[in-house]
């Protein structure tokens, strides 16, 4: 555990200890249970902000009559706490009014729904999001929403988290989530920067119920995952802490079709802390701190033949078993967010400052990589970022609500690369012993955006949300700006039917951490030389996006919806893994298009909760016009004049699940669930009968994975429960490929996880 992690952990534990000592009684940060489908139906046209997570009845804000006798300590504590809960509820509601997702398509998941998913709140965040419509699974925990590569924006309590270098691990823990929403489609003007989807998390806060949870999950792959969460409040102070440790032998997807990969251990440390202080009835400040440190072994593929020079001889003489390769990667992500929120009558605003440090270090097998590849690259990237965000809403009258805001993010990337190569002669053959080439450099990027929009209630059943935003991107490799109009219309012809349609123009800068920084010509005359030396700078993507959909409640508890979208882009951004390092590189397609349709449905009745999603999608691009040195000449020539599928395109993606809850068994309740994921497969290269290779012309075979589980809560004391849970992931042990090692920016085969048994034992108090 390095010094940065140790200091962050120590400071957060000290903060918790001090606050606990000051608190009269701790409070757990869970919201009241309610039966709901694992993925809620879209709330695209919900023009009213959701109710606060735990707003107390209005009566709680009035002072009770003076008691005839002195109150007990317990009743006095309740009388003190209820007004504070009401204040928090009003402030949460005000924050929701600042940043509503008017006209966009939003899928919500709450704490109860998390429990109804495989592994519950121990599930990785990417597995949670895979249950939403149109989300395709990729290797390394990657997600593709509506046919786009990454381009996801994460927010906590409405504040953006600056991007980091998160490649294999899942930085955010589902345990601190009170609720979350994935918002896609034609986004309102407040959303810029990353626009394929907005993952907005509302954290647990420690204001609702007393207690916490401590437990451990054990299971297949040598999994040992202890965890603890604890929340509390005392008057105006509220706090929450979540910490976990994870060790297993399935850190990265297996490159072979076996139960357990070779050399695939991971250790992960995660910490999240939340602190809030109510200044008065209309304002509060809050601080969030997160720290994650993750170590990964890179899994080996046994039986690989040695890499060869053009003359057929191996790069190095002798024998080396690929079973014994020792590549590793270390990742670290820390961030802090400080926010001030204020309500002044019809004016609501929130101002936040944030900072982040992120790093990824790939360490090669210095001998083995030379033997198999002729190249061994040690790559260390460190990204520091900071910025401010301000958002406000003002209700002019019953017909108009204005919203506006700004965001500025400044990033600095340090890249330290040492590449060990062989010298080669004019014929491309080894001509001497290996030697290192150092390439250390810095790059910088500044992103700034501002927006203004109006929510116009044209009629009782019609709302138009229109506005625009202006974005600027200045970096060491590119300088651009754009004005982006946005408009969404919501029509509710009946209480059970909602129709929405919208248009958005997007401006998406390239992720600084993925922009290639190494010089091309410094490798001329070596085993790492590229046959192409053209290296045009990576540019920002500009796109136009239209979206329309309808939702309908057919019967009490039964609802469904359909949503269609089309995007056409200039300088469409993509990225991939090139060479042997596992740090991605970004590039542009001159033109791109993505389109599709999503079908959703859910049914709730008593303890039964079900959902089903099916998404159809196509994503294509033409002509790579940046970072051309990443590709081989044949690929570059083909794509220059031909549209190809993007490597992350999956034509059909589906998910479905059902759960049932018996509330009174053993005083705590029993829950059982089953769900399934299906995909037609990500893209792979196609080889025609004539021997021509078409980039991304084929796809890996279609696949499915089914999961089942059961959870039992046993009441041992008032508000104290023992929880026992069994999850069986991929219950039929289906072996399926995520990648086969071919395709643009794909450098290795990867398989989905095989059957796993996981047992969780926890104590809620």
Where do the protein language model's features map onto the residues?
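Transmembrane beta-barrel wall of Gram-negative outer-membrane proteins
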Residues: 220-247, 258-299, 328-348, 396-397, ...
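Short acidic/polar hinge/loop motifs at secondary-structure boundaries
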Residues: 159-185
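Short, acidic, small-residue-rich periplasmic hinge/interaction motif at the N-terminus
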Residues: 26, 32-117, 150, 343
């Amino acid at each position: 555990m390095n010094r940065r992690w140790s200091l962050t952990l120590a400071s957060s534990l000290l903060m918790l200890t001090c606050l606990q000592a000051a608190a009269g009684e701790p409070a757990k940060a869970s919201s009241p249970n309610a039966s709901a489908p694992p993925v809620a139906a879209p709330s695209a046209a919900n023009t009213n902000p959701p109710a606060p997570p735990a707003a107390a009845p209005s009566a709680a804000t009035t002072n009770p009559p003076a008691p005839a006798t002195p109150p007990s300590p317990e009743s006095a504590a309740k009388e003190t706490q209820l007004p504070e809960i009401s204040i928090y509820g009003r402030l949460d509601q005000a924050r929701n009014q600042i940043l509503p997702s008017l006209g966009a398509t939003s899928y919500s998941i709450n704490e109860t729904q998390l429990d109804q998913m495989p592994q519950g709140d121990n599930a990785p965040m990417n597995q949670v999001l895979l249950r939403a419509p149109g989300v395709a699974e990729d290797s390394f925990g990657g997600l593709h929403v509506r046919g786009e590569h990454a381009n996801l924006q994460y927010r906590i309590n409405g504040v953006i988290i600056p991007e980091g270098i998160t490649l294999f691990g899942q930085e955010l823990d589902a345990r601190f989530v009170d609720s979350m929403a994935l918002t896609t489609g034609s986004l309102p003007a407040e959303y810029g920067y990353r626009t394929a989807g907005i993952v907005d998390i509302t954290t647990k806060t420690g204001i609702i119920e007393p207690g916490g949870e401590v437990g451990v999950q054990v299971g297949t792959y040598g999994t040992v995952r202890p965890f603890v969460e604890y929340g509390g409040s005392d008057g105006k102070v509220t706090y929450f802490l979540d910490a976990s440790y994870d060790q297993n032998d399935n850190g990265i997807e297996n490159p072979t079709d076996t139960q357990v990969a070779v050399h695939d251990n991971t250790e992960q440390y995660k910490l999240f802390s939340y602190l809030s202080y109510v200044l008065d009835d209309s304002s509060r400040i809050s601080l969030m701190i997160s720290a994650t440190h993750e170590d990964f072994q890179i899994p080996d593929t046994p039986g690989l033949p040695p890499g060869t020079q053009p003359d057929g001889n191996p790069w190095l003489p002798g024998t080396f078993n690929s079973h014994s390769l020792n590549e590793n990667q270390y990742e670290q992500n820390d961030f802090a967010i400080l926010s001030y929120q204020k309500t002044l009558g019809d004016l609501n605003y929130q101002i936040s400052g944030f900072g982040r440090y992120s790093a990824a270090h790939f360490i090669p097998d210095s001998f083995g990589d030379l033997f198999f590849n002729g190249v061994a690259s040690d790559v260390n990237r460190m990204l520091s970022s900071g910025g401010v965000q301000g958002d406000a809403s003002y209700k002019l009258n019953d017909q108009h609500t204005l919203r506006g805001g700004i965001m500025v993010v400044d990033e600095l990337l340090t890249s330290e690369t040492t590449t060990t190569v062989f010298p080669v002669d004019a014929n491309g053959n080894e001509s001497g012993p290996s030697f290192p080439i150092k390439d250390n450099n810095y790059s910088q990027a500044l992103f700034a955006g501002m927006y203004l929009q109006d929510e116009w209630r044209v009629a009782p059943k019609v709302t138009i949300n229109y506005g625009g935003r202006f974005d600027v991107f200045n970096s060491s490799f590119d300088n651009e700006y754009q004005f982006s109009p946005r408009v969404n219309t919501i029509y509710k012809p009946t209480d059970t039917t909602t129709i929405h349609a919208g248009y958005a123009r997007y401006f998406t800068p390239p992720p600084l951490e993925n922009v290639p920084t190494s010089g091309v010509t410094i490798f001329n005359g070596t085993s790492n030389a590229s046959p192409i030396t053209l290296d045009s700078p990576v540019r920002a993507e500009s796109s136009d996006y239209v979206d329309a959909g309808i939702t309908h409640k057919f019967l009490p508890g039964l609802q469904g919806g359909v949503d269609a979208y089309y995007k056409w882009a200039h300088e469409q951004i993509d990225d991939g893994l090139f060479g042997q390092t596992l740090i991605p590189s970004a590039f542009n397609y001159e033109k791109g298009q993505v389109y599709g349709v999503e079908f959703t449905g859910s049914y709730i009745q008593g303890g039964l909760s079900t959902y089903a999603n099916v998404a159809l999608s196509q994503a294509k691009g033409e002509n790579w016009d940046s970072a051309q040195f990443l590709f081989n000449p044949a690929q570059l020539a083909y794509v220059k004049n031909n549209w190809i599928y993007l490597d992350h395109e999956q034509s059909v993606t589906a998910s479905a699940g059902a759960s049932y809850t018996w509330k009174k068994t053993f005083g705590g309740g029993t829950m059982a669930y089953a769900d399934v994921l299906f995909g037609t497969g990500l893209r792979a290269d196609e080889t025609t009968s004539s021997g021509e290779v078409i980039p991304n012309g084929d796809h890996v075979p279609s696949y499915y994975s089914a999961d089942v589980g059961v959870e039992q809560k046993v009441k041992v004391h008032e508000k104290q429960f023992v929880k026992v849970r069994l999850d069986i992931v991929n219950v039929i042990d289906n072996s399926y490929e995520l990648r086969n090692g071919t395709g643009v920016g794909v450098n290795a085969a990867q398989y989905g996880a095989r059957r796993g048994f996981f047992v969780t034992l926890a104590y809620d108090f």
